[in-house]
Structures are given as C-alpha cells and as structure tokens.
Amino acid sequence: MASRFRHAALVGKYQAPGSRQVLASVAEFLTNQGLEVSLDTTTAMAVGLPDYGALDAAQIGKHCDLAVVVGGDGTMLGTARQLARYGVPLIGINQGRLGFMTDIPMAEFRETIAPMIAGDYEEEHRTMLEGCVKRPSGDEFDVIYETFAVNDVVVSRGASAGMVELRVDVQDQFVANFRADGLIISSPTGSTAYALSAGGPILHPGISGWLMVPIAPHALSNRPIVLPDDSEVRIEIVAGRDASVNFDHQSLASLLHGDRICVRRSEHRVRVLHPRGWNFYATLRRKLHWNEGVLPDGAHS
C-alpha cells in the first residue's frame, strides 16, 4: 500500500523508562512503511538513535509532512505548540496515562497507523490560544512575554499568598472583579484538563468557544462561563502577591499589580490525525470510564 506521506518527524517522551527501545521500534516501523524518518533535536539528543537525522521545529516544518508523537498529552501539547504554525499534522501514540490527544494505544500502533499512513484517517483541527503578558510602563504597556497554548491559560495565586483579585474584561467590556485562587481560560481541548477539575463543563472540540473558569472563588456565584472564541479576554492583576500565569504549564512567575494577561484565538490551528472511525464521545467514554457497569443497548437486568 502506497504511503500518503513522505517524511515523518518522530517526537518522544524520552524521560519514560524504555523510551529508547520504544522510539527505535516506531522509527523502524515508519521506515518499513516507506517514510523517511527524522527525530526532533531534543528527542535525538536524549535517546541517541544515530541511524536517523535530527531536525529542529523550523526544519520539521520545512521538510516533514507528518509528525508522530510518542508520549502523553503533555508531549503532544508541546509538539502542537511548536508545529501548528507550519501546518504539520500530528499522530499521537499514547505512552502516558490519560491520553485524550494521544489516542493510539502503544500496543496497537502498527496495525492502527499503517492504514493512516496510506491515507485512511480522520483529520481534526483544534483551536489554539495566543497569549501575552503586558506590564505598565508610564502611560503604555510593554509586552514582556508571549506564547501559544493548546489547552489553557491559567492565572494563579502565589504559593504562600492568599487569594488574588483579578479584573476581567471581554472585548473591552467589563465582566467582573474575581477574588479566587485563580482563573482558567480554556480552549475546548483544555476543557477535559484543569478546567474540568475546577468544575467547568466539557466542550466538544468543534465548538467555537472558550471556557472561563474561576478556581476556588470567594463568591459561590462566580460560575464558569462559555465565551465566543473571537473574543479577546483581558485579565488584570488587581491584588495579590506572587501571582503567576501558565500557558500549558509554561510558567511566568511573580506577576505585579497592574500586569495584564491578554488571551485571544491564534491564527494557527493544530492538525490532528485519528484512526478511521474515531469520535470524541467514544474517547470520553474510554478515558473517563463512562458507561461502566451499565448494561449495553438499554438491556434490563
């Protein structure tokens, strides 16, 4: 069967036990499928597979038409942030724990990926967040940090401090001042992550929206809210010491009073390839253990 792809980048969770052997077997499989295989530079330095070249993100974007990610959702998120701007599609093999985005079990990767490489797959596009931190400088604001996030942007209180007070504006319209342990702005992809544990709803990845979820708010009436994803959200630090902001766990600590975190939709989208027949609801059932102990097809005991 002819390959739909030509050159695959292989990205691995190199800290995991046995990762070198796992990555070597995936690389050999891809090569046997007729693909040229390169490792991303970080993976190559960590595992040392000399038979394969090493490419950085820009080189992957230029030379590769597929990226195969072996690891958990954290590895997948990091790769997605790096490669989304280049439009390289991702296939995720789960070597982690939950694996919402890395949906191919390690034990089944050969029989699952072979037809995908030949072009038999489902393609999904995931929205990304683009965020920056602005600091007051006279009458202006200087951008001191900017990056992308696939899951969420989280503003949190300091480790030794009490609650933070955050002013939130959406599309330059004042929403409220929140006193809480923090605030999550989540994409639909991130709605099954921190936002879910903080009491937010699950959003289908096809929904054009964000979640805004307070973390342990002082007022119980402060509830999660769904926002249109063409909105720019601005969060200002009003009170609280040592607050921090995390973009998919990329952290900027020691925010100051008056700092603003601005979040909007990125122009880039993450291309994710799934096996034929994949659907979001089956993933939820499997990962969240829904329907366990329930008789199938409405049967009665």
Curated annotation (Swiss-Prot):
GO CC, any one term: cytoplasm
Carries keyword Transferase? yes
A GO molecular function held by the record: metal ion binding
Disulfide bond residue pairs: none
Q: Which GO terms describe its biological process?
A: NAD metabolic process; NADP biosynthetic process
What's the cofactor? a divalent metal cation
Q: Does the keyword Kinase apply?
A: yes
Q: Which UniProt keywords apply?
A: ATP-binding, Cytoplasm, Kinase, NAD, NADP, Nucleotide-binding, Transferase
Q: Where does the chain bind NAD(+)?
A: D73, G74, N151, D152, R179, D181, T192, A193, Y194, A195, L196, S197, A216, Q250
Per the UniProt record, which EC number(s) apply here?
2.7.1.23
Active site residues per record: D73 (proton acceptor)
Highest taxon in the source lineage: Bacteria
Q: Where in the cell is it found?
A: Cytoplasm
Catalytic reactions of this protein: NAD(+) + ATP = ADP + NADP(+) + H(+)
Q: What role does this protein play?
A: Involved in the regulation of the intracellular balance of NAD and NADP, and is a key enzyme in the biosynthesis of NADP. Catalyzes specifically the phosphorylation on 2'-hydroxyl of the adenosine moiety of NAD to yield NADP.
Tell me which family the UniProt entry assigns to this protein.
Answer: Belongs to the NAD kinase family.
Q: What is this protein called?
A: NAD kinase
Organism annotation = Methylibium petroleiphilum (strain ATCC BAA-1232 / LMG 22953 / PM1)
Higher taxonomy: Bacteria, Pseudomonadati, Pseudomonadota, Betaproteobacteria, Burkholderiales
